[in-house]
């Protein structure tokens, strides 16, 4: 009986760790994506960091990833950049992998 309870606790701990890691990867991805978009819009320094935080916050609005993609596409188009949702999604996936690698190396 004890071994079953131990296994259950181990499973719950692993699940919690995996969920926290996924959250961190998503947050890192959104920050990197926001900084990429900020650069394309000509933002630098504190303005670029602030935009990165806006993108990060968009994840918590209804729609999640779609909201992030829509925000970046709309903001880039508003600044005169020619970009498609597919291009931004490609960058989103690229930064997800980059964020995951960064976190695994920390």
Enumerate the language-model features and the residues they cover:
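A charge-rich, low-complexity, intrinsically flexible signal that marks solvent-exposed coils, linkers
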Residues: 1-106
């Amino acid at each position: 009986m004890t071994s079953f309870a131990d296994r259950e606790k181990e499973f719950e701990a692993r699940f919690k760790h995996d969920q926290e890691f996924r959250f961190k990867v998503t947050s890192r991805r959104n920050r990197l994506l926001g900084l990429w978009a900020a650069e394309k819009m000509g933002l630098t320094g504190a303005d670029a960091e602030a935009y990165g935080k806006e993108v990060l916050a968009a994840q918590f609005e209804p729609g999640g990833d779609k909201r992030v993609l829509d925000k970046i596409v709309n903001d880039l188009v508003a600044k005169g950049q020619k970009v498609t949702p597919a291009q931004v999604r490609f960058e989103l996936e690229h930064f997800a992998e980059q964020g995951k690698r960064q976190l695994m190396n920390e």
